[in-house]
From Swiss-Prot:
Organism: Shewanella piezotolerans (strain WP3 / JCM 13877)
Family recorded in the similarity comment: Belongs to the YciB family.
InterPro entries named among the record's database cross-references: YciB
Protein task: Plays a role in cell envelope biogenesis, maintenance of cell envelope integrity and membrane homeostasis.
Membrane topology term: Multi-pass membrane protein
Cellular component per GO, a single term: plasma membrane
The name this protein goes by in its record: Inner membrane-spanning protein YciB
Keywords from the named record: Cell inner membrane, Cell membrane, Membrane, Transmembrane, Transmembrane helix
Lineage, highest ranks first: Bacteria, Pseudomonadati, Pseudomonadota, Gammaproteobacteria, Alteromonadales
Spans through the membrane: 10-30, 50-70, 80-100, 118-138, 148-168
Pfam families: IspA (PF04279)
Amino acid sequence: MKQLLDFLPLVIFFAVYKFFDIYIASGALIAATALQLIISYMLYKKLEKMHLITFAMVSVFGSLTLILHDDSFIKWKVTIVYALFAIALAVSQFMNKPILKSMLGKELVVEDKIWAHVTWYWVLFFVVCGLVNIYVAFSLSQETWVNFKVFGLTALTLINTVLTVFYLFKNMSEEDKKELK
């Protein structure tokens, strides 16, 4: 349920874009992200930092898109969010408090060096995706960018997540692997 809720704003953005335009879709994205927060709080009685940051970014860049009638802002939002994620991961690693380990370390027990590899892998992933987003957003058509944002980046993130889980699982002890089953 939680993962489906994460896709709610993206699905609404895409559907509204297909029937209307980028501006109405940007407004719908703001509303859908707010709705996501409300539903998440009602179901889980807490709000995740990532959702709050995403809502803030969507609100700021979506509002600028609407007020200034310039789709560049909503396009930049993707890259800026990815840059913030990359920075947060890098800083957490430098401070020896890796975010990914704190999120998944209880379920997936691996050595700290493996968490460092995973962290830097995700930093690189977010940087590359942010740069590719800039290229697609400002070199190709708006429709191509929307499709890339919705399908391309989502697929890349899912693939990256699966690769990360395989890598972590491969580096777990046999005893810890048995505990997961």
